[in-house]
Amino acid sequence: LGWCLVQGELPGTGQVFAQAAEMCPDYCFPNRLEAILALQCAMEQNPHDAKAPYYLGNLYYDKRQYDLAMEAWETSARLDDNFPTVWRNLALAYFNKKNEETKAIEYMERAFRLDTTDARILMELDQLYKRVRRPHKERLAFLRQYPDLIEQRDDLVLEEITLLNQTGEYEKAKALLDAHSFHPWEGGEGKVPAQYQLARVELAKQALTAGNNQEAIALLEECLEYPHHLGEGKLYGAQENDFYYFLGCAYENLNRKDEAVRYWEQATVGPTEPAA
């Protein structure tokens, strides 16, 4: 509207651009090329507006004009350094397009400090820590400061479970996973069952070492079934060799040789087609 008023040399442009600058930015994603002209006009008419360069940066980034996008976001951040999303965007751009890990982490941490209620930024900050190989125990300790945020996102719950498994806290991982109902999400295929099975296999190995063979059998048999709360079913051709191998070991310890051999034979069965 402001751009149209400017083109028509009509009154009221100042009021319209001032109002636009104060609008909530949620779900506002300019995506047409003509929006570039309108946003540039807004920046000229209201140089103190931090939202126009933010929107312009989003549009440029979508069109793969990464340097222009970052320049626009930097302008937005200078005008309003309390807007977390622009720092988040800059963090991702510096990491993915400039390979500047230190600056990316600095900006993402700043974004989260500005809004510690944003579960998405927490997830993205942890993923940055993961990419720069932050120790598992440090990441776990950081995440567990925000249990309410973790509970909002399946991927954060899964990351906590994964870190528990990676730090050897298999009982905690198992308990947390069994208490949560997951929903399918793109890119998450197979990740929840993998952690479900990992915790049980490691606990089964501990049970075997301690001579608790029946406990090990129960845990390993659970690996062969996908309960509903995992949010996905078993795929055809799922590799279960290790479960069968340890089941064979458990039955051997119980002097049930025939069953042990049967499970070991199942453990030798693999894909019938060659893989790359």
Q: Which sequence ranges carry the predicted segments?
A:
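Position-specific recognition of the canonical hydrophobic site in helix A of tetratricopeptide repeat
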Residues: 6, 61, 95-96, 130, ...
